């Protein structure tokens, strides 16, 4: 009698590659591990932010998760840059005069608000590059060569995907970013090893794939693809109005993309394999093979955040 196939365990534990380090996020704690110039690994533990009611509402939680990820990621990226340069992390030492004034007069909430603004500003620049620019280019082309509605839709889609891929290729050629993408690979391999039930050692982690279906890169390419389909129904009468509609629909685009990512992470069938395949392809640009020292950092980052009962961290 054939035994039913055992479903592979999938964890909600995940992370982010940093400058010479990795941040791992578990159900209760987050840990940032950074390789210092002297070869040692410095770790920093923080409680995982509490999830409010909004994070449980489908479609809404996608945009919230994206914004939270940007803010937390920016904070840890700054921390890792400081530690990897050889200085002990001291927030007071690295504060500018303006930041110190804000902290002294307005308190920590104002500092957090400034950090959020910095992260959101980065997001707005990305929106300008991947959402607004393709529409403006199509509008410019249409000024010289009259295009039909679907010609505009196709051209905008090609431009959007082209700009996205060109951006990824360009930044992957930068030495510092290339190392971040190698740490990205170490993060994926470590999670895969944990999900397989193997002991977290360098030898065990090394043998696992660097590609992961629930990667942030997969989410980004889903956002691009979903936006192509959703924005195709918007009017082209006014370029300014079209850009406005696209910006208003962006939270919905992120929400749909997030739900698709969660579905693909939980299910394994023909539909989910097709949906997640573009993300795996693009990971060839953002996830590289790590060396053993990077795997050591990933293990140091993930070990403190793993729940005692793996079921508490099930995806």
For the regions a protein language model found, what residue spans apply to each?
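Alpha-helical transmembrane segments of polytopic integral membrane proteins
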Residues: 73, 80, 130, 134, ...
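Multi-pass alpha-helical transmembrane bundle typical of ion/small-solute transporters
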Residues: 47-49, 66, 70-95, 107, ...
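Polar-ligand-bearing catalytic/cofactor-coordination segments
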Residues: 3-14, 18, 22-24, 150-218, ...
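Divalent-cation
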Residues: 1-93
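Juxtamembrane "helix exit" motif at the C-terminal ends of alpha-helical transmembrane segments
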Residues: 122-147, 223-247, 251-254, 258
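Membrane interface segments of multi-pass transport proteins and intramembrane proteases
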Residues: 100-109, 138-155, 234-244, 263-273, ...
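Cytosolic-side membrane-entry/anchor segment at the start of a transmembrane helix
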Residues: 2-13, 17, 99-136, 140-144
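Transmembrane alpha-helical segments and their cytosolic interface motifs
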Residues: 110-128, 208-233
